[in-house]
């Protein structure tokens, strides 16, 4: 087990206090907001002829990367594609009914995973040395990376 420094302990305590405060004071989503996110949400089949700014993409990434993963392993890797040239490289991997949708999208997110995610566990899960659990265990790495990036 890794011993946390005083600064790390303070950071953990501050993060926990911040979460508890947020949880205790957060507004409950109303029905329309819940329906927008979950109940009525569908795959999009068309787009506005409008650019998606790099700032918007960064904001989406910053939110997405905080999603929960087992042991904070965070194996997902994101590539955001805006250029027509890069989208063309995706074309042969797409199902025929998705080609027009992807080619006309202002930005495409490609999500993959890093099988060497355990190289970052000292930073992502600092309170316990779990990297050895993953080292040399390709079946566990594959399963963990897949489940925690999709």
Predicted regions and their residues:
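Acidic, surface-exposed loops and disordered segments
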Residues: 1-150
């Amino acid at each position: 087990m890794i011993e946390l420094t005083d600064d790390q302990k303070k950071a953990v305590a501050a993060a926990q206090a911040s979460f508890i405060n947020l949880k205790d004071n957060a507004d409950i989503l109303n029905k329309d907001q819940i329906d927008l996110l979950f109940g009525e949400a569908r795959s999009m089949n068309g787009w506005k002829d409008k650019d998606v700014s790099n700032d918007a993409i960064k904001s989406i990434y910053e939110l997405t990367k905080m999603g929960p993963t087992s042991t904070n392993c965070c194996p997902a890797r994101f590539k955001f594609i805006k250029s027509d040239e890069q989208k063309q490289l995706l074309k042969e991997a797409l199902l025929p009914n998705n080609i027009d949708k992807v080619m006309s999208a202002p930005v495409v997110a490609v999500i993959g995973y890093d099988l060497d995610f355990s190289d970052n566990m000292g930073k992502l899960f600092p309170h316990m040395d779990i990297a050895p659990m993953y080292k040399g265990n390709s079946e566990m790495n594959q399963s963990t990376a897949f489940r925690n990036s999709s």
